């Protein structure tokens, strides 16, 4: 059974959990070779299955709201992506504006969680959680 945990953006545990993934060429390729980043303003939602990390969704806290960007799900698993989405929504609550920069092929999963499209690019869609 997959569980999700939250880890602050500069906690030592975060690096221990996700370093093998974010430094993996296949994972970087899935992120269009864009590096993953973190600061104290990030909270990472990490999906773990049998002691293995199977996905993560970093959420950056800004003045204007929170932003999901540069997430990863092993094997492009929609159930894991949906689970991470649910964990983020539960933790963030309805009072905070939530945005997401989503890969086009994941747009439907985010729509199932109440996100609406704001802007579309070639590979990504900017979405906002509908209030």
Where are the regions that the model predicts?
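Conserved acetyl-CoA-binding loop-helix of GNAT-fold acetyltransferases
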Residues: 76-93
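Conserved acetyl-CoA binding element of GNAT-fold acetyltransferases
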Residues: 60-76
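Conserved beta-strand in the GNAT
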Residues: 46, 51-60, 67
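Conserved GNAT acetyl-CoA-binding A-motif
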Residues: 91-104
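Active-site rim helix/loop that mediates acceptor-substrate recognition in acyltransferases
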Residues: 23-48
């Amino acid at each position: 059974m997959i569980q999700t945990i939250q880890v602050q953006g500069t906690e030592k545990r975060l690096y221990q959990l996700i370093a093998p993934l974010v430094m993996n060429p296949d994972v970087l390729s899935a992120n269009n070779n864009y590096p993953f980043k973190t600061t104290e303003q990030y909270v990472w939602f990490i999906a773990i299955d049998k002691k293995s990390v199977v996905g993560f969704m970093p959420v950056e806290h800004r003045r204007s709201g929170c932003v999901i960007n540069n997430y990863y799900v092993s094997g492009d698993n929609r159930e894991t992506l949906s689970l991470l989405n649910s964990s983020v929504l539960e933790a963030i609550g309805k009072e905070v504006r939530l945005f997401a920069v989503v890969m086009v092929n994941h747009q439907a999963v985010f729509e199932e969680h109440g996100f609406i499209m704001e802007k579309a690019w070639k590979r990504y869609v900017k979405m906002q959680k509908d209030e």
